[in-house]
Structures are given as structure tokens and as C-alpha cells.
Amino acid sequence: ARANARQNIADSHQKLALAGMKKDIVAVKIKLRNNEELSKEENSIYLTYFSLMLRARENQHYQHKIGMLDEDEWSSMLISFKTLFKEPKHLEIWEYIKITFSEDFVELVDEQIRQSQIYGQDSA
């Protein structure tokens, strides 16, 4: 069952990675890296993409809570949160959409953001 959970997570990551390679998403990522303003359409596209990314992370959180995700995989996910939230746009989107997530996931994400802001990106 654990192997199946891990495979499902890997499949989900692969789908998100492929979605992140689509032209419209790549264009938005480039604009974000260059600190360029996004159009309303680009904001909408990226909001959807980032929301899906967080839903996948919420699923990982759930899998960990029920014992289906091992500690190594969980630790990797927590570290990746710190990288994910280095992008100011991600923080902006999170503040906007976090009310749509489970309370314990919101607490987890907010704590990871707080830790990375206090201790820097290398804290785990």
C-alpha cells in the first residue's frame, strides 16, 4: 500500500511537471523570474496551476497523516515547501486560496513559510 501511495504521488508530480512545461505556464514563470507584471489572464492561468500544485501537496500531507508516506518522502516534501515559497507570487496566491484547504494543512504550510522567513531557506 505504501508503494502504491508513493507511486501515485510520483505520477501526480509527473503530471504537474508536464503541465508546468506548457508554453503559457513557462511564459508566466519567466515573467515571474524577471519580476514582470502579469496580465489578468496570466494571473488566472498561474493561480490554477499553483492551486493544483498545492492540492497535490495537501494529498501528500494526508498520505503522511494516515501512515502511507514514509518519513524520508515527507521530509523531502517539507524542504521543497521552503523552495516553493521563495517566490513572492506563491505567497500572494497562498494567502488568497488558503481558506480552501484543510485547517491542518494551512497550519503546516504557514509554519513552513514562517520557519523559512525566520531561519532562512536551509532550515528543515
Regions found by a protein language model. Name each.
Residues E42-A124:
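An amphipathic alpha-helical interaction surface
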